[in-house]
């Protein structure tokens, strides 16, 4: 845990008592702050109180006594309208911050030279975070990984000069971190997302920009116009900017040439790493993730040999194009995290012949945006509530069956794929749907796929992230 010593002897209010909220409250208390916490969920309040955290409805609190208000990133700060606690805090002139801001202040207080790599973007954040941390760890560096990837940042070990921090940041977290100041800030990409919470694409992009604007070195993917404009703006302001591209040769920066990762310096090219044969980093989208990780690791002092070794040993993330098993020429891939069409596109673009398991609780737009990948699909196996709509979209373009359940889909897809003599084929779960019609969440759905695949006679499991 990182004790939040920057608020020692001060009173702090806190709202949001999920897992990260309780962890943040404990860090404040350990640092010597007096914390008063609340949540709209009575069960969460009771759980926090049972751990010794002082709780009270903040509507009746004396806000003039608080030095800061710590807000859970899941609670609306501005849109669709500010949460009632935010209005109370602002009315009393109390600053509103989140756990990432607490971490940034503690790093400056305890070890301002501790390498800090912060990652954001609409897609690819978690893979880039995990990959960067893995490369650092495999090179023997003291490395802590947390943030939006699943471990509350204040539960990490405290900052010290040689300890590396790799932190995934959502737009909600950045919005609550006004002094975020990473050694290397990574902005991968920007597409419309979370606009219910941010109002407009412009506001969403401006929040993401803060992470790289506050960084010592800004590493920015320039394959979309929003990020390209941010890179130009920061460079004009005198900031060090490293551009990356997964599809375009650059004059300066890092780009992908097939499976080779290239560095460009004033138009002169050299290969810095390669992804050939690394199953966990297959696909153009993973080239972008790897480029960002390579640039960040070079920034904090790793050499190319250390980086290549880390790339080759990266196990990948569970439920994200995760290779879970193989039987002869048939590969089984769990991409359960693909809960909409955009998220399914990378996997569909990464394999030439696919037995595709899709469906679940449908999202707006369906699978029409994936039509360009239909020629790669040997057959589709449709499950869940989306099956009728998906079958209508596939029409005569792709052979399909309505399997109904995931277990039936895996069994039928494996049977058909085994008879395919066209070379390597893949049984791919990339649902393009939420899971809630048949499963608790995408993780449970992915585990069900793994179990169904491993139950097939002759399938050999592939080690990876579990």
From Swiss-Prot:
Superkingdom in the source lineage: Bacteria
Keywords annotated in UniProt: ATP-binding, Cell cycle, Cell division, Cell shape, Cell wall biogenesis/degradation, Cytoplasm, Ligase, Nucleotide-binding, Peptidoglycan synthesis
GO molecular function: ATP binding; tetrahydrofolylpolyglutamate synthase activity; UDP-N-acetylmuramoylalanine-D-glutamate ligase activity
Pfam families: Mur_ligase_C (PF02875), Mur_ligase_M (PF08245)
GO cellular component, one term: cytoplasm
Binding-site residues, ATP: 121-127
A GO BP entry: cell wall organization
Record's catalysed reaction(s): UDP-N-acetyl-alpha-D-muramoyl-L-alanine + D-glutamate + ATP = UDP-N-acetyl-alpha-D-muramoyl-L-alanyl-D-glutamate + ADP + phosphate + H(+)
Listed NCBIfam families: murD
Designated name of the protein: UDP-N-acetylmuramoylalanine--D-glutamate ligase
Native species: Mesorhizobium japonicum (strain LMG 29417 / CECT 9101 / MAFF 303099) (Mesorhizobium loti (strain MAFF 303099))
